[in-house]
């Protein structure tokens, strides 16, 4: 059985969900309507083919369940993350069988959490509502306590994915990668290998690279991040610092950034929006 897991989505906590949605719309993305989880976090989705960005906040009247022994609380992790910062909180890989992945994580020594099943209502572009449902299996890197990791199995994908919402005016075509930063990336090699299911990965003095079936997961040193992105990684300790999106026409996208007065820099054939201008996470745009 092939256990190599592709990128599924990124959890991006923000204080003002509508402001974040408006910012991504300025960048030329189609942003979905506001949805609410049963426990009270609320999200807006930016879809790509097979992957998405989850802009998320804690809604009014939220009933957040705390973490318990053997039980990971998604809502509590988002709440605690937002109490300290905005940004990129959780890396999510796709699963075809969350319970099998939970067993694999337990065997590898990175699990120990009960699987979590839930459903919520989703609004389609025409305003109608459908139900989407998921099963999650969580993993933990004890050396990266402020980074969340889980896999997501979709039970009603036909109600979630929408090709029309993937036709972004800015030409964005894929979530190409994510970047974690750590003082010593090698410390996270064993965990990331078990989490992604990738045994043959690249390890250099700059960091680690895992080529998943959909997108790259990399863990870089602070110095390597500064070299690759042209900016320093914000924050301390192991943390998720950036995401990379592929666009069809980089020059056209740059013209959009200029027209919208979005601050960015051009670096190593990429356009980069620093985290202080993008709700706490660096955004890198590359050509397809």
Enumerate the predicted regions with their spans:
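Glyoxalase I/VOC metalloenzyme domain signal
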Residues: 1-7, 13-32, 48-117, 123-288
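Short acidic/glycine-enriched loop/turn segments that link adjacent beta-strands
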Residues: 38-42, 267-269
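Short beta-strand scaffold segments in enzyme catalytic cores
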Residues: 44-46
């Amino acid at each position: 059985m092939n256990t190599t897991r592709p990128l599924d989505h990124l959890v991006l906590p923000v204080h003002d969900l509508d402001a974040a949605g408006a910012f991504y719309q300025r960048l030329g993305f189609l942003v979905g309507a506001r949805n609410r989880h049963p426990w009270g976090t609320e999200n807006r989705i930016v879809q790509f083919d097979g992957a998405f960005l989850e802009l998320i906040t804690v809604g009014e009247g939220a009933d957040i369940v705390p973490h318990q022994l053997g039980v990971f609380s998604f809502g509590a992790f988002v709440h605690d993350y937002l109490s300290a910062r905005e940004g990129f909180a959780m890396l999510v890989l796709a699963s075809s069988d969350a319970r099998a992945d939970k067993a694999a994580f337990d065997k590898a020594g990175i699990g120990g959490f009960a699987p979590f099943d839930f459903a919520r209502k989703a609004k389609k572009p025409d305003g109608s509502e459908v139900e989407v449902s998921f099963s999650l299996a969580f993993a933990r890197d004890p050396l990266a306590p402020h980074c969340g990791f889980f896999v997501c199995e979709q039970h009603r994908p036909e109600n979630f994915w929408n090709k029309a919402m993937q036709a972004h005016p800015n030409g964005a075509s894929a979530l190409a990668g994510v970047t974690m930063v750590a003082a010593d990336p090698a410390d996270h090699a064993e965990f990331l290998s078990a989490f992604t299911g990738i045994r043959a990965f690249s390890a250099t003095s700059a960091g680690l690279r895992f080529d998943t079936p959909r997108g790259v997961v990399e863990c870089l040193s602070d110095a390597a991040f500064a070299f690759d992105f042209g900016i320093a990684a914000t924050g301390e300790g192991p943390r998720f610092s950036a995401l990379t999106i592929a666009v069809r026409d980089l020059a056209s996208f740059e013209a959009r950034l200029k027209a919208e007065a979005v601050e960015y820099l051009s670096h190593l054939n990429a356009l980069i929006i620093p985290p202080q201008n993008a709700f706490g996470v660096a955004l890198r745009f590359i050509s397809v």
